[in-house]
Amino acid sequence: MNSLLNDVQRQKALLEKNLKNFAERFPALERSLRLQAELFPCAAVNRSGEIDNRFDAVDNDSGETDNDFGANDNDFREADNRLKIFEAKNGEITASYKDLLLHSRYNPSSEAAKTLHTEFVTQADSIVFFGSGLGYGQAEAAQSFPSKNLIVIEPDPLHLLQAFCVFDWEAVLKVPSCVFLVGADTQTVISVLEHYGLRDAAVIAPKACTAHAQAYFSALASLIARNKDKQDINEKTLQKFGTLWLSNMCKNLARSMSLNGINRYKDGAPHLPFCILAAGPSLDEILPHLREVKKRAVLVCTDTALRSCLRVGVQPHFILVTDPQYLNARHMADLKAPESILITETAVYPDVFRFKCREIILYSSLFPLGRYIEQFGEKKEPLAAGGSVASSAWDFARFCGAKIIYTAGLDLSYPANKTHARGSTFEEKTHFISHRLKGTEMHNAAAVYTNPAYTNDNKAADYEGNPVITDARMLLYAWWFESKAASFPDVKTASLSAKSLCIPGFFLANVCDLLSLPVREKEIDDFCFFQTAGAENLTDTPSSPRQNEDNKTDALNSLQKDLCELQNTVKQAAEVCGRRCRTEADYTQVLNELSRIDELIYKSRVKALASLVFPPPSQLESIAQKSLPPAPPPPPRGDYKTAAAYNILKSKLIYTIILQSIDTHIHYLKKNGLFL
């Protein structure tokens, strides 16, 4: 039998060694783990494989007894009794949890190698482990892929301490990019995974290694799937609208440089309630009371709901517009709101900038060209984008310092098979196009049931627990609001309709609750129109026409210079790719030269501009598969010259696409008289 299994002192020494190595990388987390070790029972087992609770606590000179993870000694002992450690057939240590094998009962190391040496893992930039196991998978990853990001997610510190007692984690802790998420909530985990790149991560999630926290890992897997869906949607949106955004920005550039930003409102109204007006069917419930609500809360209206609000004679304090499409601009066609402030972004359809209102202000551009131009004028604050204009409206309320936000019309579903509020552009359009053989109700039913993303998900329910009809797109929006509610717990958000899709983190309120608030009309007007409140943030006073023109000239001159420099640099790289190579030295020289040029491209101030009309990774891979021969195996399995030739060929393809992107920018800038 493996002598470590019944040698308490050796296990104690191994735990101490692992904790010391852990402290070198994660000192704060190690202190928390060491406190857990004070309560940690024995990891030693007897020959039957049962836990033997006679292990002393590891040395701890701190004298602290707090438990940062919120567990207690009884919890640990109960969890330990479900984890059995025993000897594998090859003499290594293995384990089971609730009779599920964490590792092979024959050869744990070989099993880990087979799991990790797959194309899926080899091509990933990061390897993510759900659960610590005993450490065989992590050790194999450290040995075989030391240059990858290694991320270990373990919600229960007990299981990591148990692994530290019976397996040497030194190799894992020596990996340059190694991350341990121990006891972290799912939102924190998602944030870290997004930082390292979820799309390029290989997730290793054996059922046995996640059984001790099944609900946690199930929730995390759902969040990862939603996040990947969001990335897919973003890629497709960029592919579809990238050129439109670029065209709109070039048309709006001169006008936008003379506009102020939302900066003045930052944290200016923590004492005021906000009400977000979206265009869902439940907006009809609040419209009769909207005039009174305006006296008690700051109204932030989406462009889709504006027509309905004006129909009842109420001009909201703020109007949000984010979508760049022409059809979206039609929501505001023939409307005017001289008492309202319009908040938008430089890439919207140009007609938006001709809307008649009190003032148009901007938030920071979502796109590289807009952010580049902003460097030469007033710095503008950003707003989050969750795929829906309502998400930007919510984030604007949070940006203003709101502690309570009410939402009306944020249904994210089809209550009573309705699609939009009465009086909205969508609803009016169905009346306009309906006829005797296809009435309004048939159009609404078609909008619901022929939606490609339609799903009758029984888990989707309103605030009273009744099932609702929704689709995958709106569920993704709901997840965005859920994640923001978790990220900003001090901001309370309420739905004014029980018929809306229930968003975890939101609570249900009645319009009477809002109407029972005191009238604060003067305070609201002072904040919105900056007469008194928020005066400390009024640094964005309008620039003179002369200053605006100077800023515009400086921005365009710098943009032209930087684009031309990048264009010449990329052309030089493409020429280097065309050199003929015969020997390994020739290939090495070309690759070194390309590395030097890549450094210059990376340092360019306009390198990000190419991303707007650059193919997303999935499409780029598809282009490469169609344009290039199959990738040869890398050395030492393959020939160096063959692999180098393929890399040079692929680099040339990428440089060609970058040049096309630069040419597209120059084309639209010239078309609008912004490029000499």
Model-derived regions, located:
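Acidic/Gly/His-enriched mid-domain segments of enzyme catalytic cores or analogous surface patches
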Residues: 160, 164-242, 310-402, 626, ...
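Long, compositionally biased charged/polar accessory segments in the mid-to-C-terminal portions
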Residues: 475, 480, 485-676
